[in-house]
């Protein structure tokens, strides 16, 4: 259904009351992007192409695992797959390991049983690094004794084991009480909920990984455990001039990140609500609130936001998801997430293609439940004025798309900014971005509703040829959309462009007919 910004329904509740389970969404246009983690089961050009056909937009590499040779093979396979879909970009994301705390290695690398109520020691003394047992366990965070308070809880192995701090024995030793039965194993992750961790933003491994990403042309960084705006700047410093076009997406995974979110949002290019570690660092029911809060703030700022972790987790080993998982994906879309992410489902799962298809179908249905006109009016009302010229044009384009009942907004873009700002105001039609900037085309998959196309024909060499070049790009973009089934001949299209080439010149809006 298409409606104008001033027509009914005037509220979200009215729109929801008109939904019909018999309505089948179109299969050729999904606004939300899908991120898939590539693992051993999916690391081939053939498999990545199959995932793309199922709906994949962004390839994720998890640098907590795998060698540089392995990750290079993922990049090569992704680029080979991209070539099979001429003009349609595929983005590549590098997910950093980030600052993390781990236990040491147990004696003989065996598991040691512990019972609730058992009292033992945690030590930062390196002599216990490979001598852990049920009496003493090494922790590789030197400042843990200084930073943690008595009475605080320490989680080990994603919360499988929990301990309460009883006493600070000395500058490197804690006495703790085991709160549940379990096993002490080697090299398990440690979480300190409610404790400010002063680890450096980037380890030496992270710095090397970022430099690898720059050299191999990744499009975005998923930066783990971002706690302050300074963490984002530290990443940009490592990326340097050569990597200045790489988007930095800050993963919010602990209370510090939530507390400092406003300053992080100003500095970062986008955000990931990483619910796994976040659900350990803060009470699990509060993750629900954090997800809605962080997504809303990103929407208001016009910055892309990803919802991640366990979205279709049961599909790792089952052909169908639980109903709760489907609702989780759908509600993330309703919350305002630009992208949804698959982890183990595609990295190691038995049903990677089915997982992407299910994500695709769920997003399609969820997007029908959004009242776009009331949402646009709310976003426009909340916009701080005066706006920059490019944002004014974006607002006008989205407004015109409602009033003209347009089937698409087509954006001629250099940097992707105008497409991102159109996405901010959530039109109910696709945003077709035509650009010569391959990197901008790829990372524009982060923005909801944006369909990026890479235009390969050379730029006009003089101002006299500029308008002819504009008309050629508009016609080419519409032809590509017709070929994909997004547009039909005769459809109304809103077009925005610059008065000349280069960055920051977007100031022109037109209403066209697809011919």
From Swiss-Prot:
It comes from the Eukaryota. Its EC number is 2.7.1.40. InterPro entries: Pyr_Knase, Pyrv/PenolPyrv_kinase-like_dom, Pyrv_kinase-like_dom_sf, Pyrv_Knase-like_insert_dom_sf, Pyrv_Knase_AS, Pyrv_Knase_brl, Pyrv_Knase_C, Pyrv_Knase_C_sf. GO terms for biological process: glycolytic process. One of its GO terms (cellular component) is cytoplasm. K(+) binds at residues 62, 64, 95-96. The record marks 251 as: Transition state stabilizer. PANTHER family: PYRUVATE KINASE (PTHR11817). Belongs to the pyruvate kinase family. NCBIfam families: PRK05826.1, PRK06354.1, pyruv_kin. This is Pyruvate kinase.
């Amino acid at each position: 259904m298409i409606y104008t910004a001033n027509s009914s329904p005037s509220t979200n509740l009215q729109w929801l009351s008109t939904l019909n389970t018999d309505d089948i969404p179109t299969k050729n246009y999904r606004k939300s992007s899908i991120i898939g983690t590539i693992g051993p089961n999916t690391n081939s050009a053939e498999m990545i192409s199959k995932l793309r056909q199922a709906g994949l937009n962004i390839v994720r590499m998890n640098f907590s695992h795998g060698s540089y040779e392995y990750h290079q093979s993922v990049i090569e396979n992704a680029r080979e797959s991209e070539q099979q879909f001429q003009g349609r970009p595929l983005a590549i994301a590098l997910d950093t390991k980030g600052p993390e705390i781990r236990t040491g290695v147990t004696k003989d690398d065996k598991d040691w049983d512990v019972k609730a109520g058992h009292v033992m020691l945690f030590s930062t003394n390196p002599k216990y690094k490979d001598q852990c047992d049920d009496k003493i366990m090494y922790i590789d965070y030197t400042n843990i004794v200084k930073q943690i308070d008595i009475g605080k809880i320490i989680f080990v192995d994603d919360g499988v084991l929990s301990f309460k701090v009883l006493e600070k024995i000395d500058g490197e030793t804690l006495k703790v009480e085991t709160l549940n039965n379990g096993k002490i194993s080697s090299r398990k992750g440690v979480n300190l909920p409610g404790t400010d961790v002063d680890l450096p933003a980037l380890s030496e491994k992270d710095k090397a990984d970022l430099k690898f990403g720059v050299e191999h042309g990744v499009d975005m960084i998923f930066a783990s455990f971002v706690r302050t705006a300074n963490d984002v700047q530290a990443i940009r410093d490592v990326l340097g001039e050569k990597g200045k076009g790489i988007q930095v997406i800050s993963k919010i995974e602990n209370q510090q990140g939530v507390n400092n979110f406003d300053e992080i949002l100003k500095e970062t290019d986008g955000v990931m609500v990483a619910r796994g570690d976040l659900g350990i660092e803060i009470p699990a029911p509060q993750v629900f609130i954090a997800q809605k809060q962080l997504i809303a703030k990103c929407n208001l700022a016009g910055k892309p936001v990803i919802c991640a972790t366990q979205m279709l987790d049961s599909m790792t080993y089952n052909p169908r998801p639980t109903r709760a998982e489907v609702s989780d994906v759908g509600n993330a879309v309703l919350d305002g997430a630009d992208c949804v992410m698959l982890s183990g489902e595609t990295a190691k799962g038995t049903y990677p293609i089915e997982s992407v298809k299910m994500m695709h179908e769920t997003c399609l249905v969820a997007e029908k439940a959004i009242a776009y006109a009331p949402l646009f009016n709310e976003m426009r009302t909340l916009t701080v004025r005066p706006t920059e010229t490019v944002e004014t044009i974006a607002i006008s384009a989205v407004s015109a798309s409602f009033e003209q009942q347009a089937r698409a907004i087509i954006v001629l873009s250099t940097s992707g900014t105008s497409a991102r700002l159109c996405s901010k105001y959530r039109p109910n039609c696709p945003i077709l971005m035509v650009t010569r900037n391959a990197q901008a085309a790829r990372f524009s998959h982060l923005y909801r509703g944006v369909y990026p196309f890479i235009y390969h024909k050379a730029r006009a060499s003089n101002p006299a040829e500029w308008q002819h070049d504009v008309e050629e790009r508009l016609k080419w973009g519409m032809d590509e959309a017709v070929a994909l089934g997004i547009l039909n001949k005769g459809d109304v299209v809103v077009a925005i462009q610059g008065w000349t080439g280069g960055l920051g010149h977007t100031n022109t809006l037109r209403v066209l007919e697809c011919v």
